[in-house]
């Protein structure tokens, strides 16, 4: 029997008085006990080795090393461990674990964390605790993986069967190692058949309760397969691209699918006079008319390309780099056509989604004499509002995409890692993790690569100063030929006539005559500081008479400055 730890010193708080421990209130009451304000916590020594610990939990965990107890045994080999974390880490060495089965649906998961997340997302509400209880009962059965539907768990022959017979009847579900006797079932008072029947009854009850709330829960619709195709789980049809999957009728919202008794489609009263294509909304016709017109009012200031919509121009300007995106969009040119002027005035920055056609805006009727179109908000204002949080959107598709955040459903699942996503775009972006290889968006100025184009644009802000310097240098180089050239230096004859001193580069030394002795190189110049002239003794600077006369002669000729 292990000796009990000594009682804490006087003035130190007991273990239950530590407050929240590692929570937010950890720094408030640290080191303050009931004995006095600011009293330090007394360390707790180990009675066996004398090691000091700050908290009783650390001391009790340390005392397991002296006791030799290993309560967490491995069910596959004779090894045992002191902590459950060590056991879970050891189980990974036996190979992949069999999947865990959900008690409410036939889905399986390789990790307990994924099963808990599935229960919280799919079977949310009051059914989560019941589902966890069913899972705990099923995982407590002999085998870790899901049993066949027709098979029943093994039972002991009699209540008084020996432990060896129970171990022999225990099925071996793992290829590596043999189950230890600690994990084998012993003779229990209640038969195992009653437990399995109770678990099945609870699972059936849970499925019945979840069926009532199936109307507000979205089922899994799309699955990313191993061959990178998108599989529709409703009709089992695979698609190669995301656009083909979105056009699939199974992914349409409720009420818009054919034959489901939803609201009737809006009549298409607005018809194009050129191709006879009809539209249900006037602004859809206005946007369609741009296909037939040659009017391209949005011109790129960098390369001169013209576009029909401002959104097309904004997407094109990414080619010219981040500096082009920082500049404002140029305004559309003024047109004499009345219809185009009405379109440009009502179009707004998005370029056509909220623009009305000229005929519908001038008159009070539609294109073919229908009823007047309802008054629409100004361009850029939200038209669709979320009933849950009141957030506004300009497009109905954005409102549908936002509704997933309130439902909590994740209808898009990756088949490789069982990870779930709210949007199809997130699933397609996640596929790059399994594809491997370099990211598709490299930075042109550094070796970094990014998986998203937006991340690359955000990263290029770091090179903004460098790009601005390069742009300024290019501007200076472009302006250099236009500046007047510097005046040429005056000629030698002009300088001699004006009496100006010639530069040293233009003075040529005459070669010495053959009979003259070689001259010594000129002495280096001597520089005197101002402190030399502050001395009272000027004898060192007295010059001889010949030297004074020569200097006076030069000064008279103008060659020496006075």
UniProtKB/Swiss-Prot annotation:
Modified residues (Omega-N-methylarginine): 92
Pfam families linked to this entry: zf-C2H2 (PF00096)
ZnF C2H2-type: positions: 44-66, 72-94, 100-123, 270-292, 298-320, 384-406, 412-434, 441-463
Main location: nucleus
Subcellular location: Nucleus
Function statement: May be involved in transcriptional regulation.
Name of this chain's protein: Zinc finger protein 579
Source organism of this protein record: Homo sapiens (Human)
